[in-house]
Amino acid sequence: MALDQSFVGRTYPPTPAYEVGREKIREFAEAVGDTHPAYVDAEAARALGHADVIAPPTFVFSITYRAAGEVVRDPQLGLDYSRVVHGDQKFSYVRPVRAGDRLTVTSTIEAVKSLAGNDIVDIRGDVHDETGELVVTALTKLVARAAEEA
């Protein structure tokens, strides 16, 4: 089923705030094998001009992908989640994510198209801190694979 083109430009409500903790940053850095000292040591982060530890660049994926899930679960869009794979991901940072940040994500559908029977949706996730400052924009491409022929 083709996706509804009228959804391009639709913006979803912001997510509840996610509080970024030092331990979550440490766990994430360890999980992805990133040993940069600024991710685990506040003194190392301060030496680089940050008030506290900062998160690896891909840390926000977990909260932006969860926010993109709101788009995917919208029954009116018509995306078959059972066939969805992650196609691409890009981040554009204004500043690093820091321990203590309280972040919300607002998702907007940037593009909807069909290609070779696959449905493709591009979602922009704008991540703001509690003051409303834009921290990072995540661009996520999701692909709902074409149904297999019997």
Swiss-Prot record:
Cystine pairs: none
Location of the MaoC-like domain: 10-116
GO biological process, one term: fatty acid biosynthetic process
One GO molecular-function entry: (3R)-hydroxyacyl-[acyl-carrier-protein] dehydratase activity
Coiled coil: none
Family in the record: Belongs to the UPF0336 family.
HAMAP family: UPF0336
Protein name per UniProt: UPF0336 protein SGR_2883
Organism: Streptomyces griseus subsp. griseus (strain JCM 4626 / CBS 651.72 / NBRC 13350 / KCC S-0626 / ISP 5235)
